[in-house]
Amino acid sequence: MDYGKCATQTTHKIITAEENKRKLTIDNPSGKVVRKIQVDGCLQIKSGKRCDYMFEIDAPISQVIYLELKGCDIKKAYDQLVATINIFRVEHGECKKECHIVASRVPRAGPKVQQLKITMLKNKQAQLFVSTDQAFVTI
């Protein structure tokens, strides 16, 4: 899919996305092709909810990382991730999927967060990670 000016492609060893003091850092030691796509505020999508960024790994795509940088509303962030997965379900059908919520405050592995992780895995075949302020991923 062509994302136009909303995407940048790189093989850099360190790739980041940052917004309002919240940050995801992707460690790419083997120099894989990574396409960083700004979804919210750039892509013209009819659906209202969407996550902030997604990262497509390799060509053809073998893995997708969906990212929502959020204040403290974990449920809203979860809904935005699910909406984005649904929008790109054809393009990312069989890919390994990871979803990251990087929030300013996160309830300590409480039952609500655990339930969201279970639901995401069951319904969308995607792992959900919830972090405070910063998250790190190695691909």
Language model feature labels by segment:
Residues 1-32:
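Solvent-exposed, charged helical/coil patches
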Residues 2-4, 42, 101-139:
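Domain-level recognition of nuclease-like catalytic cores that cleave nucleotide substrates
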Residues 20-58:
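Active-site metal-binding core of divalent-cation-utilizing nuclease and nuclease-like domains
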Residues 45-46, 73-81, 110:
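Active-site-adjacent loop/helix micro-motif of nuclease/hydrolase catalytic cores
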Residues 53-55, 63-71:
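Conserved catalytic cores of phosphodiester-cleaving nucleases, focusing on short active-site segments
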Residues 60-66, 96-98:
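Glycine-rich, often proline-containing surface loops adjacent to acidic residues and nearby aromatics
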Residues 74, 88-113:
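Nucleic-acid nuclease catalytic cores
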Residues 84:
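An active-site-proximal "capping" alpha-helix that borders the catalytic cofactor pocket
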